[in-house]
Amino acid sequence: DETYDYSNLDMYSRMYPALSEIQEYLDKDGSKPFLLVEYCHSMGNGPGDFEDYFQMIQDNDKMCGGFVWEWCDHAIAHGTAENGKTIYAYGGDHGEEIHDGNFCMDGLVYPDRTVHTGLLEYKNVYRPARVISYDKESGELVLHNYMDFDDLKDYVKISYELTQDGLVISKGILPEFSVAPHGEGKTNLKINVPENGKCYLKLIYHLKKELPLLDEDHILGFDEIEVSKEDTKCKLAEKWIPKTVVDSELQVNENDTQIHIKGREFAYTIDKRTALFTEMKFAGREYLNHPMELNIWRAPTDNDMYIKSEWKKAHYDKAYTRAYTTEVVQGKHGVKITSHASVVAETVQKILDVTITWKIEAAGKIDADIAVTKDDEFPDLPRFGVRMFLDKKLSAVRYFGMGPQESYCDKHQAASHGLYRADVGDLHEDYIRPQENGSH
């Protein structure tokens, strides 16, 4: 085996090492500090592991940080499209034979230095302080100061907001208190948390004094803590749900291919061949303009460059749902419909084995339970979900959840819970190379 002599180097370094690879080095050797030459590749909707690497760096004294690749997308402006947006050209767009395609489009900002959501994620991961603990009964709040030289009271001022179901119900400014660099400090923040609803306490870190590049009060980051009590149902959402007569009887009729469920204010149809809804009419409005689908496909991100060929080989992009058996059980207060189905594609074996259970109440409420088992021979799924094709007139969105920008299971540090309004088009993140985006 070829070996290398590292004796003249003061540190050990790797490009894009997995966390397990870093831990293995720290456990087995660790004689030199570990430097991440490049990490968190920021291509398109890509940098989803900032928090994991931050924790690794902070938890190990032998980790000396690293360099995110990279700052900006590199592309050339080529005029504007019909919609008024700038056209950006990259590798291959000028007729050259040898090029790297869009591999130069891997930054935290767009070519015009507009911020990517990845930079927002990066910013909040590296906020100056973090909540260690909060006792909502006593009000004791413990913070850790991540600054190397500044006492927290000299660098930031901290405001807070208490929200219930996304609406701010109280706010204020914390009194100054000392937290030494890389130390912990305590203060008291006593708040009155409502007995019900989804409640969150948000601490916002503001720059205390103007710096050469930053204004006073510039937001440096935030922490969010759930402080809900036992009743966590979103009361605001309950108010949105139209009031219906709950004791009205259901009419359930079925034939060889369809199940029709009708109540006083709604009419639903389920296709027995797919076990999914083809019609959802409620309070006089039809919501679906295309049958519902189980979905495992999405537009590949740039960081899917290697696995996307496996996805295509598995025909994930051509998958559809097929139901085999359906059982209908009608009770006093509703109907339960259970189907055995699968997600399949032509020329390949069954991808997913699926059990779908719909419980429909007399008032029209639908509870769904979808249990899925994947064939281990297939690669990891791009995603799994239910697609509902709504009338295009339903373009205004109001939701309680994480926002305002897109967020994912591994990319949500910059998002917080709130009540958000937007047009459907505004939820789109316009990556220069079209790809998965806009998860809210």
Give the residues covered by each predicted segment.
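Terminal connector regions
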Residues: V193-L236
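Exposed beta-strand and adjacent loop surfaces of beta-rich binding modules
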Residues: S138, Y155-S159, Y200, Q258, ...
